[in-house]
């Protein structure tokens, strides 16, 4: 059974590792200007039915949660989380840095 306690405690799927080895020596521009990033963005646009959507990829779960929460909540709102919830135990500092309180139940 997989247990995703965070972004980095499980190994990668074998197919992903194979593909990384296959493409390892390719010379590509960084910062999201490569063909793989563009392909991923197109797949996301298609899946969402939004061909004109701006897609921004982030490198980790904490960063992603902080950006999404900060952009969705009003300044006076907070996040309600279980006491044992990942956002409370592992990400609260990142969330509260944006000015939002994590309210543990």
PLM region descriptions:
Residues 1-19:
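N-terminal amphipathic/basic leader segments beginning at the initiator methionine
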Residues 64-72:
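Buried hydrophobic packing segments
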Residues 3, 55, 102-104:
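Conserved beta-strand scaffold positions in the cores of enzyme catalytic domains, especially
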Residues 13-61, 83-89, 94:
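Conserved N-terminal alpha-helix of the aminotransferase class I/II PLP-enzyme fold
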Residues 73-105:
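PLP-dependent aminotransferase-like
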């Amino acid at each position: 059974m997989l247990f995703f306690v965070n972004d980095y405690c499980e190994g990668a799927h074998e197919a992903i590792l194979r593909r990384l080895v296959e493409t390892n020596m390719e010379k590509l521009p960084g910062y999201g200007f490569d063909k793989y990033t563009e392909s991923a963005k197109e797949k996301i646009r298609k899946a969402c039915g939004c061909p004109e959507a701006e897609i921004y990829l982030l490198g980790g779960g904490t960063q992603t949660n902080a950006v999404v929460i900060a952009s969705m909540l009003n300044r006076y709102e907070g996040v309600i989380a279980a006491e044992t919830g990942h956002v409370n135990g592992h990400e609260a500092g990142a969330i509260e840095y944006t000015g939002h309180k994590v309210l543990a139940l």
